[in-house]
Amino acid sequence: MADATISSDIQRRLDAGVQWGLRHWLLIINTGAIVYAGLPWLSPMAKAAGHPLIGELLFRLYTPLCHQLPERSFFICGHQVAFCHRCAAMYTAIALAGLLFALARQRIRPATLKMGGLLLVPILLDGSTHLLDDVFGLGFRGGGDAIGTVNFWLRMITGALV
């Protein structure tokens, strides 16, 4: 008899948790996106504030997720952000789009899969040309990687479109 009571209590709590998640799905996704997009920026700030271990842990957390090439990354107070330009633009845009969607979701229609696919074309072209240039040294992307160059703006714009 005690097992049935515990089981039904667990089931009731599980149901309540699922219901809460279904009601607040956008809050959950936006919170995750903001945390994911924000932590890489805290890495150089922690290092600059005298907490090198925390900064390095945050940096290494994102190592498997981004190439982190210094010439393609932002720096704050002389320390590298844990994302490259493209990833920074992409994940910041996702977080901002989620917040804007939360404000305007009653007034906008969902995008079609075709539109989503079209928005991926620029980043696929940009990323594949970078890959080909890096692997084969073709030189057609040799304009440099500094902020303000064509390569920088292509990475930022295509990252934000995703």
Question: Which residues does each predicted region cover?
Answer:
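Hydrophobic cores of alpha-helical transmembrane segments in multi-pass inner/ER membrane proteins
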Residues: 33, 91-98, 155-162
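N-terminal signal-anchor transmembrane alpha helix
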Residues: 23-53
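Small-polar-interrupted transmembrane alpha-helices in polytopic inner-membrane proteins
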Residues: 32-40, 96, 109-134
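Cytosolic juxtamembrane amphipathic/interface segments immediately preceding
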Residues: 9-22
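Hydrophobic alpha-helical transmembrane segments
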Residues: 82-102
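Membrane-interfacial loop-to-helix junctions in multi-pass inner-membrane proteins
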Residues: 20-27, 106-116
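Extracytosolic (periplasmic/ER-lumenal) interhelical loops and adjacent juxtamembrane/interface segments
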Residues: 45-83, 139-147
